[in-house]
A protein has these predicted regions:
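Aromatic sugar-binding surface patches on proteins
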Residues: 220-226
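Residue-level detector of intrinsically disordered terminal segments
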Residues: 9, 42, 56-57
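Residues marking helix boundaries in flexible regions
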Residues: 14-17, 28, 44, 62
Length: 328
């Protein structure tokens, strides 16, 4: 990964992993790092590109003019964008071995394991799971950290995989138990928009933790890495199809302009009345459940939020299922 002041500032953001396994036993992380650049050149080659067009919603992935080099882009104020225009996400594929990108999936194994799948009744969980795109592992691999802080402390296994492929995908560039992955993509977003890069929401992996990053992809002319930090010495596994990175568009240029305001609930009588009514309704329904009321037991849970209903009316805008578009 090319280093600069900006890339160093993004290292803490990293949140994507890539995988592979060596053909003959573990490969030390130092060896992985040493051969990574040459292997990536062989793997990812020139300027292959993948994009889709026809933006009608925020989730569209659209083509950006190849005639506009990254370093020449100017970032206009967001108010200069057409009203209602969907932000753009262009995914420049850096070669034939870039990891698959798919719309975020709702399901989680731990949510499936809850009684009657009740975790899916929490709409914010499901919406978070699907509010972005997953970058997924193309194969099975495992990595081990021995607890030391040097770059040689991480070894990797990917039986049957060319060691050069492994070296192109994972390194121990930052040491300290941090595993670095290359996605095989360079992303470009609309002016003022960046990518929030992280692990898949609500999807923990024992022994290792995905690091979050906010990347200014509206101007960045090189790819970012995805980094995971071991939480203890152990071996962790990624299976083919597991998400190792999750990307979500974020209007980062607007955030510094947000001015949080303290207010009393008494300042908004309508909001207070709706809040009090919600609390009363919830308490009554939960009491009926505890008492075994047949109607409440049959209903199981209140669905007002799921259905976008509040204060006796419908929400002006409500979504209970994401429909993000895939790359075509």
């Amino acid at each position: 990964v090319r280093e600069s002041h900006n890339s160093r500032s993004m290292r803490g953001i990293a949140s994507i992993v890539r995988e592979s396994r060596p053909a003959a036993g573990p490969i030390a992380a130092a060896q992985l790092d040493a051969g990574a650049d040459a292997a990536k050149d062989a793997m990812w080659g020139g300027a292959a590109r993948l994009s889709a067009s026809g933006a009608t919603t925020m989730s569209d992935i659209v083509t950006e003019s190849a005639a506009c080099p990254a370093h020449a882009l100017e970032v206009p104020k967001l108010e200069a964008l057409p009203k209602g225009a969907a932000p753009q996400l262009t995914c420049y594929q850096l070669g034939p071995h870039a990891a698959p990108i798919i719309p975020g999936r709702r399901d989680r194994a731990w949510m499936d394991a809850t009684s009657e799948h009740y975790a899916y009744r929490c709409l914010p969980l499901s919406m978070a799971n699907t509010s972005g795109w997953e970058i997924t592992s193309p194969l099975d691999f495992e990595v081990t950290w021995n607890g030391n802080q040097d770059i040689n402390a991480i070894t990797a296994r990917a039986p049957g995989v060319d060691p050069n492929v492994l070296r192109a995908l994972i390194t121990s560039h930052f040491a300290h138990g941090i595993l670095t992955f290359h996605t095989g993509w360079l992303f470009r977003t609309s002016p003022g928009w960046g990518l929030w890069v992280r692990g898949a929401p609500n999807d923990a992996k024992d022994g290792i933790h995905a690091l979050d990053g906010m990347v200014e992809t509206d101007w960045l002319p090189f790819p970012f890495t995805m980094n995971w930090r071991f939480t203890r010495p152990c071996t962790v596994r990624f299976r083919k199809g597991d998400p190792f990175c999750f990307i979500t568009l974020c209007p980062h240029a607007l955030l510094d302009g947000v001015a949080p305001r303290r207010a009393s609930i008494e300042d908004d009588p309508k909001l207070k009345a709706d809040y009090v009514e919600w609390g009363k309704s919830r308490a009554e329904f939960n009491k009926l459940l505890r008492d075994g009321d047949p109607a409440a037991v049959a209903k199981k849970w209140q669905r007002d939020y799921f259905q976008g209903k509040a204060g006796g009316g419908d929400a002006p805008f409500h979504v209970n299922k994401r429909r993000l578009k895939p790359i075509e």
